[in-house]
Design a protein with these regions (language model features):
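C-terminal, low-complexity/hydrophilic appendages and adjacent surface loops
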Residues: 18-21
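Acidic-aromatic/histidine active-site loop/patch
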Residues: 39
């Protein structure tokens, strides 16, 4: 783990996605953070020690999903399945719910972790990540802690490495190159996840805070807001946290009454033509009961 002394920084961004705005000054206290996302090898040690069964390994209870056909009540997870050609981005046609896809079988039955030991663990829910953190004597980061760490001392820069997207024409993280979702040119060498530390560290010596996998935080999702100044109170919030569990729900959206946590960092599926979220300020609302092949996590220790 690497210790960060904390401090005041400008959180958020303007000019990209509305859920990132406004830019606001916040303060975080000192904390330590994992140098990389938790790897398959590390997660395997946790499972061996505790017998933990992940969310994706448990068949859904039909009572929790009214109207679901019984034949679909099988364990599994969402796997990226690139289409042969262009598709409507709103269709999300590149995702397949694959029975038997788990952290140990990331592409479904017949796949293994051979050669992926030092890749980030995926197909883990928020509860799986929190269970690992508790076992390790750690915690999941807040959104503010994650963004502070991801910025690596570059105050106000668009990217974790500066304001130039690809310095010298070289990818600085594992993200999608080419037309998404059907034409990855593999300029960074990876179609899916990559081994941690495959790309240069940021200014704090941290790896993979941008790209590779989205990472769970422990904050409920909400749109940012600026607190009104109150007499006798400092105008810079300290250690801000997200919304309430209830407020994180998008009752009119596809996730319905399922609470949502904030994901940070972007992933190998973020593309300039589709999802420019390979930036410290980027954020995404992920239902806590949804697991995919591009979401992982890392841990912090506060104080």
């Amino acid at each position: 783990m690497i210790r960060l002394d904390g401090g005041v920084f400008a959180m958020g961004a303007e000019g990209f996605y509305p859920e990132e705005a406004p830019v606001r000054r916040v303060r975080v206290d000192a904390f330590r953070i994992d140098e990389t996302p938790v790897t398959n090898a590390q997660f395997a040690r946790f499972v061996a020690a505790t017998g933990h069964v992940t969310f994706a390994e448990v068949p859904p209870d039909p009572k929790d999903y009214p109207g679901m056909p019984p034949e679909l009540a099988q364990a599994g997870s969402l796997v990226f399945d690139p289409p042969p050609g262009p598709v409507d981005p709103a269709s999300l046609a590149w995702w397949s719910f694959r029975f038997g896809a788990t952290w140990q079988t990331p592409l479904g039955p017949g796949s293994t972790l051979e050669g992926l030991e030092d890749h980030p663990v995926v197909h883990v829910s928020h509860s799986d990540a929190a269970a690992y953190a508790a076992w390790a004597g750690k915690a999941l980061p807040s959104e503010a802690e994650f963004e502070f760490a991801a910025r690596g001392r570059l105050e106000g820069a668009d990217y974790a490495w500066g304001d130039v997207f690809e310095p010298g024409g070289r990818p600085q993280a594992n993200y999608w190159q080419g037309p998404f979702p059907h034409g990855n040119t593999l300029e960074d060498g990876w179609l899916r996840t990559s081994p941690v530390r495959s790309f240069p560290p940021n200014g704090y010596g941290l790896h993979d805070l941008i790209g590779n996998v989205w990472e769970w935080t422990d904050d409920w999702f909400a749109l940012p807001r600026i607190e009104k100044k109150r007499p006798g109170h400092c105008c810079i919030p300290a250690n801000p946290r997200g919304a309430s569990r209830a407020a994180s729900m998008d009752r009119k959206g596809p996730s319905g009454k399922t609470p949502r946590k904030v994901l940070k960092g972007g992933s190998h599926l973020c593309a300039e033509s589709y999802c420019r979220r390979y930036r410290p300020a980027a954020r995404y609302a992920q239902p806590i009961d949804t697991t995919t092949g591009h979401v992982g996590f890392r841990c912090v220790v506060r104080g």
